[in-house]
């Protein structure tokens, strides 16, 4: 791997406090670009010799290989961050990406679970009463009730939960911490889970969510658990932990929460990220409209 790429990854790791998952994504994108340049430049990759044309040719190559515009733009973002780093460090004098734009994409609206469907799932008998069943039910409850990311959920330790204050301390992206309140119902579920866990599993590691062997639950296992349970909802097009994060935000806004408050609970750095959920409030707008006396009238002048 190029020494400058290595330096950039260290910068992300130690100065920006990016997660290893994010750093690995940057690494793969930059390695892919390095391989492309080497193929065109007889095995040589010198960042200072990269020009706009080769970046654009890389984009064309990705699209020709059926890489989606969304993925191409993500890769391009990684490359832009890399060259911004090189510019700041004085390794390059010109940024070859300053005039490069990615392919246009249609921004899909977030998938979310309807409140009725979620209630039927969580209050139903689709979970066993053993350790894993109690744990899995709580996982879905916490994702839906708090809006945390799956990495944040598996990263919870017992000491992060204050049952008296009814607050959860969550460590998010770049190690930023935030406090999320929880209700009495969720408190009872968490206490019930810890009782079963401490009785049936050797959980001395300190992690809140663990496997049967007592080790910390991984994001991969959590994803599988959520996907399996959400697949019981036939109308749901996508089944993932992030869908429950979308559902949390949607429910909060539909029930009158302010956008800024939802932003803080989700751990977003800007309102722009949170505003994608405002589309769902159209359901409430329709209800308001249909409360209008003229909206209740059937027919109309020409429909008499």
Regions inferred by a protein language model and the residue ranges of each:
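Conserved catalytic core of the tyrosine transesterase superfamily
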Residues: 1-304
């Amino acid at each position: 791997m190029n020494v400058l790429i290595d330096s950039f990854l260290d910068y992300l790791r130690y100065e920006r406090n990016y997660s290893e998952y994010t750093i690995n994504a940057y690494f793969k994108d930059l390695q892919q670009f390095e391989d492309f340049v080497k193929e065109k430049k007889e095995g040589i990759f010198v960042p200072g010799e990269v020009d706009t044309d080769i970046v654009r040719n890389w984009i064309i190559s990705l699209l020709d290989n059926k890489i989606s515009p969304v993925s191409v733009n993500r890769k391009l973002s990684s490359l832009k961050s890399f060259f911004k780093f090189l510019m700041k460090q004085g390794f390059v004098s010109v940024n070859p990406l300053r005039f490069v734009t990615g392919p246009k994409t249609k921004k899909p609206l977030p998938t979310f679970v309807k409140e009725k469907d979620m209630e039927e799932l969580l209050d139903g008998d689709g979970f066993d009463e053993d350790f894993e069943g109690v744990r899995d039910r709580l996982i879905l409850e916490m994702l839906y009730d708090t809006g945390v990311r799956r990495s944040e959920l598996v990263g919870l330790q017992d000491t992060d939960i204050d049952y008296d204050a009814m607050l959860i301390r969550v460590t998010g992206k770049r190690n930023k911490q935030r406090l999320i309140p929880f209700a009495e119902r969720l408190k009872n579920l968490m206490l019930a889970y810890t009782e079963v866990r401490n009785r049936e599993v050797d959980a001395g590691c300190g992690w809140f969510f663990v496997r049967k062997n007592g080790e910390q639950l991984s994001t991969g296992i959590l994803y599988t658990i959520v996907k399996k349970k959400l697949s019981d909802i036939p109308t749901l097009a996508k089944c993932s932990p992030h869908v429950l994060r979308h559902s949390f935000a949607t429910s909060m806004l539909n029930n009158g929460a302010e956008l800024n408050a939802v932003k803080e609970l989700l751990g977003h750095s800007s309102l722009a990220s949170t505003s994608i959920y405002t589309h769902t409030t159209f359901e409430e707008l329709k209800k308001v409209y249909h409360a209008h006396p003229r909206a209740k009238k059937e027919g109309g002048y020409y429909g008499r």
